[in-house]
Amino acid sequence: MGKYIKKSKVAGAVSVKDKSHPPALGFRTRAAAAKNLALHRLRSHSDEADSFNYLQLRSRRLVKLPLLTNTRKQQKQQLIPSVNQCQTKNPRASSGPAKKLEPDTTTEEACGDNERISRSDCNFGDKGFDLESENRSMISDSKSIQSEIEDFFASAEQQQQRFFIQKYNFDIVSDNPLPGRYEWVKVMP
C-alpha cells in the first residue's frame, strides 16, 4: 500500500500555531489549520478592511482601492445631467406638433466627447412617423408573402401526395383507400 501514497516534499516547512486557543489533544487536520490561519489573517487585517473594499477569495484577498470606485461613481453622476439635457430636447415630449430642432452646440458639449449623441438620436420628430408607415407597409407585404410561400410549396405538396398514392394506394387528402396493392381496414379507436 505504501507504493500508492505520494509523500509531499516540503523544503522549508513553517508550522502554524493558533495562539488564541489552548492546544488540543490529538492532531489537527490540514483543513482545520487552514481555517484557523484564515481566521487569524481576517482578525489581523480587520483594521485594513475598513479602509479598503476587498474581495476575499480562497487563496488570497483582492483589494479595490477606494480611488477607483469613487471615480466611477463620479463619472456616472456627470453623465446623468448630460443625458437628461439630451432627453429634454425630444420634440415628442412637448404637446405640440413635432418639428425639427436647430443644431445646438450646447447639447453636444453637454453630452461629452466620448458619449456624443448625434442630433438625430435626440430628435425623433420626423423619424417616428416614418417608422409607423413602414410598419403598416410591412403588414400588407406579409399577406402577399404568404401567398407566394403557399404557391411555392403547393407543387411540392402535390408531388408528395402523388408519391403517397402510388406507393400506399391511399388518398391522404380525402382520407379514402384506393384499390391497389394494399387492403385498408378501418380501425375504430
UniProtKB/Swiss-Prot annotation:
Keywords: Cell cycle, Nucleus, Protein kinase inhibitor. Residues 73-107 are annotated as: Disordered. The keyword Nucleus applies. It is found in: Nucleus, Nucleoplasm. Expressed in flowers and at lower levels in roots and leaves. The keyword Cell cycle applies. Residues 73-93 have a biased composition (Polar residues). GO terms for biological process: negative regulation of cyclin-dependent protein serine/threonine kinase activity; positive regulation of DNA endoreduplication. It comes from the Eukaryota. GO terms for molecular function: chromatin DNA binding; cyclin-dependent protein serine/threonine kinase inhibitor activity. It holds the Pfam family CDI. GO terms for cellular component: nucleoplasm. Belongs to the CDI family. ICK/KRP subfamily. Interacts with CYCD4-1. Does not interact with CDKA-1. Inhibits CYCD2-1/CDKA-1 complex kinase activity without interaction with the complex. This is Cyclin-dependent kinase inhibitor 5. It comes from Arabidopsis thaliana.
